[in-house]
Curated annotation (Swiss-Prot):
Regulation acting on activity, per entry: Activated by phosphorylation.
Stretches assigned to the Protein kinase domain: 36-328
Record-stated family: Belongs to the protein kinase superfamily. STE Ser/Thr protein kinase family. MAP kinase kinase subfamily.
Keyword Amino-acid biosynthesis: no
Binding positions (ATP): L42, G43, C44, G45, T46, G47, V48, N49, V50, K67
GO biological process: stress-activated MAPK cascade
Keyword Transmembrane part of the UniProt annotation: no
GO molecular function terms attached to this record: ATP binding; MAP kinase kinase activity; protein serine kinase activity; protein serine/threonine kinase activity; protein tyrosine kinase activity
Name of protein: Lymphokine-activated killer T-cell-originated protein kinase homolog
Annotated Pfam families: Pkinase
Length: 339
């Protein structure tokens, strides 16, 4: 009796049930985000908190910064911030520059909240360092430090504007993270970035410039045409922050009295009308007290905060000038030996 012939397909290995994959990072490694109480809080923003996540394993891993929606956020605003976080993850995933915080993963934590995992850019924001310096009774940052921040942030903006055709949209000291003694300087929080067209304009009628009020240029306050120069205006005010240790257009009040009275005193002395009148303009700067060594930074601040956007320099121009100055400074400090 002839044995029956079976087709090869009859002996296929039974299919195993598909496994549910864990979220992975940019390198393909599964990611598990701890609940918020198990991570150190680094800071907070509008509707979000940022935590430090120390990664455990057989090998040494760099820590990550984890951004997630604040649990105390108003229920009606949660969807808005979730959408913004998703948008930031999408944008950040496409960016790679030494002066911009890098993307690591977009996943869900054990508590069910959406999380954006990012490169740990530093222990503190530039704003944290400004506040600390002011509380210690110190004056402006050393000019070398300001020039270094100016160059590194300008390089990040150049990459965003020219290579990625993106407006950051919320440039300020809070969105610059610092590692160590200014060893690393990176721009963060690209969640409100806007696309730029070939003319460096935000031409999408649906796009809305958000920014932060004290750093907004006149054109943003008056519903004008938004270009890359909106970032440059806010960049200039960020340098001003480092020279004055203040928030643009908000006078720092004398806080020698009881701490309990500070908030009440501020409310009584704050001139709201004057504040709104000053928005979008160049805040005063005492260049004489700063001294001659700050002249380059004072001039850059003035150029960046011109009311007319067309008179402000581009990020490319700023980088070119600052890099030239940096090279010149190095040459001037070299010892020349003549035989």
């Amino acid at each position: 009796m002839e044995a029956s012939k079976e087709s090869p397909s009859a002996f296929k290995t039974p299919c195993k049930p598909a496994k549910v994959k864990s979220p992975v990072n940019a390198c393909g490694t599964p990611v598990t985000i701890p609940a918020s109480p198990f991570m150190k809080k680094l800071g907070c923003g509008t509707g979000v908190n940022v935590y430090l996540m120390n990664r455990m394993g057989k090998q040494t891993h760099s820590p990550w910064a984890i951004k997630k929606i604040n649990s105390k956020c108003a229920q009606g605003q949660v969807s808005v911030y979730q959408k913004r976080l998703c948008e930031e993850a999408k944008i950040l995933k496409d960016l790679k520059h030494p002066n911009i915080v890098g993307f690591r993963a977009f996943t869900t934590a054990k508590d069910g909240s959406k999380c954006l995992a990012m490169e740990f850019g530093g222990e503190q924001s530039l704003n944290d360092l400004i506040e600390k310096r002011r509380e210690e009774g110190l004056q402006a940052f050393p000019v070398d430090t300001i020039e270094k921040v100016a160059l590194h942030v300008a390089r990040g903006l150049l990459y965003l504007h020219n290579e990625k055709k993106l407006l950051h949209g919320d440039m300020k000291s809070c969105n610059v993270v610092i590692k160590g003694d200014f060893e690393s300087i990176k721009i963060c929080d690209v969640g409100v970035s806007l696309p730029l067209d070939e003319n460096m304009q935000v031409s999408d009628p649906k796009a809305h410039y958000i920014g932060t009020e004290p750093w907004k240029p006149k054109e943003a306050l008056e519903d004008g045409v938004i270009t890359d120069k909106a970032d440059i205006f806010a960049y200039g005010l960020t340098l001003w922050e480092m020279m004055t240790l203040s928030v643009p257009h908000l006078e720092m009040l004398d806080t020698e009295g009881d701490e309990d009275d500070d908030d009440e005193s501020f409310e009584e002395d704050f001139d709201e009308d004057a504040y709104y009148e000053r928005l979008g303009s160049r805040p005063a700067l005492d260049a004489v007290t700063l001294g001659g060594s700050y002249q380059r930074m004072v001039e850059l601040f003035c150029l960046c905060t011109e009311e007319d956007p067309q008179k402000r320099p581009s990020a490319a121009h700023i980088v070119q000038v600052l890099e030239s100055n940096s090279q010149l400074s190095k040459q001037n400090t070299e010892v020349i030996v003549i035989d």
